[in-house]
């Protein structure tokens, strides 16, 4: 692909290499390292003048370091006379802080959007924002990709299902569950829950005809897995035959791996928007999001529809 440069951040270089490979490109020669005092150093070692530059950084842990790295890389690119700059952020951190749920708190998702634009991005590519409304925090084009087609394709090829039902772990994820259910040709269920404080959830009940079925719980993020495991236990108690979990972003914080390992969940399927390979455990299966992002980049460059990837 002519006229395109791909710059990889350090947070998920394997994914960046896969995306570049899909497009038949190599990664641009760039030095991203840390000074002895902890400051981030960015240096682009080849000309990018007049190119469409895609900077790929997933805002994984350490989140603040990777966010600052993204901003500095965008600034370095902006000062190098490119034709256009696209920030590719497979996992958009701070997305769960998208409103003031209590007095005197920041809207962190909006601030991150402002910083990315100020640093120089002309366009943003993201995958499964926690709240789709975050797109409205940007004043530049946002290509909001969804991993549902990728997860569906993997499930179809690798999981034998006789009588499935897709379950959303909360009311906010119903659209995601419906999209997957439509592809699988099955019904949906919804978990009703109350979250008393951050990172803790109390699962209440499930709406839907689930008895005797194979439940596929679908979510955007698996963090500490408390909600997910509680949902799985509830479904088993309500009579489902099997439980499979899938999500776009596998953070797996704190006790997540232990919880999932000891849970009734048979498989945990996530994409590689985050570098999950170091947290590999027996139930984990990882599917690459690179072809989806790569195809979106190709279509942007060709001026063809990106949204048709999901319809």
Swiss-Prot record:
Heme listed as a keyword: no
Coiled coil spans: none
InterPro entries in alphabetical order: Pribosyltran_N, PRibTrfase_dom, PRTase-like, Rib-P_diPkinase, Rib-P_diPkinase_bac
Cofactor list: Mg(2+)
GO terms of biological process kind: 5-phosphoribose 1-diphosphate biosynthetic process; purine nucleotide biosynthetic process
Alphabetical list of Pfam families matching this protein: Pribosyl_synth (PF14572), Pribosyltran_N (PF13793)
Domain of life: Bacteria
Binding site for ATP: 37-39, 96-97
Binding residue positions for Mg(2+) 1: 130
UniProt similarity note: Belongs to the ribose-phosphate pyrophosphokinase family. Class I subfamily.
Protein known as: Ribose-phosphate pyrophosphokinase
The organism of origin for this protein: Aquifex aeolicus (strain VF5)
């Amino acid at each position: 692909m002519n006229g395109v440069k791909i710059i990889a951040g350090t947070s998920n270089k394997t994914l960046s290499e896969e995306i570049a490979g899909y497009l038949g490109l190599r990664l641009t020669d760039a030095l991203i390292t840390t000074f002895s005092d902890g400051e981030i150093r960015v240096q682009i070692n080849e000309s990018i003048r007049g190119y469409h530059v895609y900077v790929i950084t997933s805002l994984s842990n350490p989140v603040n370091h990777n966010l600052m790295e993204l901003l500095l890389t965008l600034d370095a690119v902006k000062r190098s006379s490119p034709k256009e700059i696209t920030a590719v952020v497979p996992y958009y951190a701070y997305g769960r802080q998208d409103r003031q749920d209590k007095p005197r708190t920041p809207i962190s998702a909006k601030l991150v959007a402002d910083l990315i634009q100020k640093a120089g991005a002309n366009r943003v590519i993201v995958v499964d924002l926690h709240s789709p409304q975050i797109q409205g925090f940007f004043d530049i084009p946002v290509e909001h990709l969804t991993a549902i087609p990728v997860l569906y394709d993997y499930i179809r090829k690798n999981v034998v299902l006789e009588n499935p039902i897709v379950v959303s772990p909360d009311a906010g994820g119903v659209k995601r569950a419906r999209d997957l259910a439509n592809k699988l040709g099955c019904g949906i269920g919804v978990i009703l829950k109350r979250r008393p404080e951050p990172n803790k959830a109390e699962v209440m009940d499930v709406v839907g005809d689930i008895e005797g079925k194979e439940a596929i719980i679908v979510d955007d993020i698996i963090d500490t897995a408390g909600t997910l495991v509680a949902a799985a236990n509830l479904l088993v108690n309500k009579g489902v035959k099997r439980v499979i979990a899938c999500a776009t972003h596998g953070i797996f914080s704190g006790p997540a791996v232990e919880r999932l390992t000891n849970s009734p969940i048979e498989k945990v399927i996530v994409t590689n928007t985050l570098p999950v390979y170091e947290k590999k455990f027996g139930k984990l299966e990882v599917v690459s999001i690179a072809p989806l992002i790569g195809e979106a980049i190709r279509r942007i460059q060709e001026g063809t529809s990106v949204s048709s990837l999901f319809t």
